[in-house]
Regions:
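Class I S-adenosyl-L-methionine
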Residues: 1-23, 31-34, 39-262
């Protein structure tokens, strides 16, 4: 489980192929944000680099609402070929000791960039992308210089002052949203506003329940979303339809169109 070859193959084979397709369609200087688990971030970042991108920075999405996954050893001790008394004694001696999984309270986000043509300035003038918008602010008072730490929940006055974005709620996620890992709208908006201009095109090849599309609509960006799961694709369509902007969503699902990266 902890050294699952399929996970390793995904990043060394499949994810490189995905990143190469994104590299092909991005303009020079275009940005690519990719979320990961802390344990596999290094393999994801290497795959992105191997596809031709430059890793510009790494973001931390900080949160506290998560369940510990460490497992107790009691189940394994009971299966040992020793007496019940020895099992009890061993369990007591290892009380509190669990499998090596601490509570995960952050999600790393790779910030990659397709290499620019000539200089950053010339690339910005030519392609309208390459720089970051430091007019975007963070924190409770919305007055802090943008950083690579983001949180959408109140943690402490010091952290909130510097890094807090708006906390997602049920209305934001949409009715009947069954997606298990809905990204906070505020975090998607932050990353999009930081690196794109109005009327830019944002591509999300794994759009899930549509948070990226909703963020683009509220920020006056165009978007392309791709999703294999038909149920998630419909949730995304519904969320987009609830917005007041007249931008059409085009989500591909397995039953209707063979998904592809443009």
């Amino acid at each position: 489980k902890y050294r699952n070859q399929s996970n390793m193959d995904f990043f060394s084979i499949d994810y490189i192929d995905i990143a190469k397709k994104l590299f092909r369609v991005l303009k020079p200087g275009g940005f690519f944000f990719s979320f990961s688990s802390p344990r596999l971030y290094h393999r994801m970042a290497c795959a992105i680099e191997d596809a031709g991108f430059d890793i510009r920075d790494g973001f931390i999405w900080l949160y506290t609402q998560n369940q510990p996954k460490a497992m107790s050893l009691n189940h394994f001790i009971k299966k040992m070929p020793i007496s019940e008394q020895e099992q009890i004694k061993l369990g007591e001696s290892l009380s509190g000791w669990k499998t090596p999984q601490v509570k995960s309270c952050f999600e790393p986000i790779a910030m990659a960039q397709k290499p620019v043509q000539s200089t950053f300035l010339n690339n910005m003038l030519e392609n309208n992308v390459a720089l970051v918008n430091t007019n975007i602010k963070q924190g409770v008072a919305n007055n802090m210089f943008p950083s690579n730490v983001i949180t959408s929940e109140s943690i402490s006055s010091v952290i909130d002052r510097a890094f807090l974005t708006n906390k997602p709620n049920k209305q934001e996620k949409g009715e009947n949203n069954i997606h298990k890992t809905v990204k906070p709208l505020s975090i998607c908006k932050y990353l999009i506003a930081l690196t794109t201009q109005q009327n830019s095109v944002v591509l999300d090849p794994f759009i899930g329940s549509g948070t990226t599309a909703v963020a683009c609509k509220t920020l006056n960006r165009n978007y392309v979303g791709i999703e294999l799961n038909a149920k998630y694709a419909q949730i995304a369509r519904n969320r987009v339809a609830d917005q007041q902007c007249a931008i059409t969503a085009d989500f591909a699902d397995r039953q209707q169109v063979q998904p592809r990266l443009l």
